[in-house]
Amino acid sequence: ATNSKVMVLVSQNVSVGSTSSGNAIGLQILRDSTPIISTDNILFGFLSLNWGDMAFNYLDSAVGGDGSTSITYKTQLKSRDSGETVTCQNSSNISSITLMEIGA
């Protein structure tokens, strides 16, 4: 609907591996090609290989549109330091994005 907000609920499975400790990642959520929230320094563990699920919630109040246009949400992850490897959905684990429209 016009002027609706969208609650974005993300459960992201991720693993981070490196040859050192103190792994960290950056994550952003995008609406179509526009980043709507971004962080560059999520500490993910103190071992050389770490994995698990991260949860992020975001109320997108600047969706725009007239209610008839499709909107795509997605996540992007990156390593903080060179030499780290970031993998999503490791070992067939599942990630999800749940969207809830909140009327104007």
For every predicted segment, state its role.
Residues 1-104:
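Terminal beta-strand-rich extracellular "head" domains
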